[in-house]
Design a protein with these regions (language model features):
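P-loop NTPase catalytic phosphate-binding loop
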Residues: 1-103, 122, 127-153, 157
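Cytosolic-facing regulatory segments adjacent to core modules
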Residues: 106-109
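N-terminal low-complexity segments that are often proline-rich with Ser/Thr-Pro
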Residues: 160-163
């Protein structure tokens, strides 16, 4: 198991048959065992439609999806950019909440919220970790283009929101 705060960005790379999918599934499974559904939401992107389909049974518990989305596991490449854009909007909203709470990261924010030092009437809410897992990222970039790179490039502010 690993700490999301210490590894906010991970790229798994390797040749065909080297265990990338096995590694991703091990990471996902370890997080499922470590966190309660209220603490963690996954956004799974699976252009091949077969790698993450086993997680459809946890759709109502651990998977996040857009309000107008049909499936929690994104298999349509055209919907990936829209989903990543929505995640960036959520990230900006979270930064505003972190700033208003005078904290530096999500862990401190949630501790403050749990200890009732943040007022829900002022928009404060418990923030689950959001973990985006994209299978075949290289293929996605080739298909969806530069838009995916814009939304997935790590920035210093991403690091603060994930801690």
């Amino acid at each position: 198991m690993f700490d999301l705060c210490k590894m906010p960005h991970v790229l798994v790379a390797g040749a065909t048959g080297q265990g990338k999918s096995v590694g991703l599934n091990a990471i996902i499974t370890s997080l499922l065992y470590k966190k309660h559904p209220a603490e963690l939401k996954f956004v799974l992107v699976d252009p091949k439609k077969v790698e993450f389909s086993i997680y459809s049974v946890i759709e109502h518990h651990f998977l996040a999806k857009l309000p107008d989305g049909e499936d929690a596991i994104i298999t349509d490449v055209t919907k990936v950019v829209q989903t990543l854009n929505s995640i960036c909007i959520e990230m900006d909203t979270r930064y505003d909440l972190l700033k208003a709470a005078h904290v530096r990261n999500i862990k401190e924010y949630n501790e403050k919220f749990i200890n009732r030092r943040l007022n829900p009437e002022k928009g404060h809410k418990f923030m689950p970790y959001i973990v985006v897992v994209i299978d075949e990222f290289g293929d996605l970039i080739m298909t969806a283009g530069k838009d995916c790179l814009l939304y997935t490039s790590p920035s210093p502010r991403d690091y603060a929101a994930s801690r």
